[in-house]
Regions:
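Non-catalytic signal-transmission and effector/linker regions of two-component phosphorelay proteins
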Residues: 1-7, 13, 20, 37
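Two-component/phosphorelay signaling modules centered on CheY-like receiver
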Residues: 13-31
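Active-site beta3 strand of CheY-like receiver
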Residues: 46-52, 56-57
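Short amphipathic alpha-helix used as the core "switch/output" element in two-component signaling
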Residues: 60-79, 97
Length: 126
């Protein structure tokens, strides 16, 4: 098990449960929250290694703007954690925009568990 603290942010409780189950077998601390509004308090201590952040919060939202907003807020921190964005509504333009803004990776739902773990491990080993 890797000694890492990961925060998963998604408004879908089923996604949060699934990610917690998958990731808890590989990483020491998994914190799940359904709203990005909670991120500033969770990141205050600087002990988070990675944030897995959904890009859309709320019914009918598909543009990724919320995820990009919160990516910017995270990267403004003194020592920001790595951020991997995850979405069901991804396209090449959104992925490129996310990476240019500073995301370390971009994952499309539904994900492959093995590929997800490899992506997180790769980012954490940097």
């Amino acid at each position: 098990m890797r000694d890492a603290k990961i925060i998963v942010v998604d408004d879908n409780e089923a996604i949060l449960r699934s990610l917690r189950t998958v990731l808890s077998h590989e990483f020491k601390t998994i914190v799940t929250v359904s709203s990005p509004v909670l991120l500033p308090a969770l990141l205050r201590n600087g002990d988070v290694d990675l944030v897995l952040l959904d890009m859309n919060f709320g019914t009918g939202k598909q543009g990724g703007g919320e995820g990009l907003f919160w990516l910017d807020r995270i990267l403004e921190l003194k020592n920001p954690p790595a951020v991997i964005l995850i979405t069901a509504f991804g396209d090449i333009e959104l992925a490129v925009s996310s990476l240019k803004k500073g995301a370390t990776d971009f994952i499309v739902k539904p994900w492959d568990n093995e590929n997800l773990i490899q992506a997180l491990t790769h980012v954490l080993e940097r």
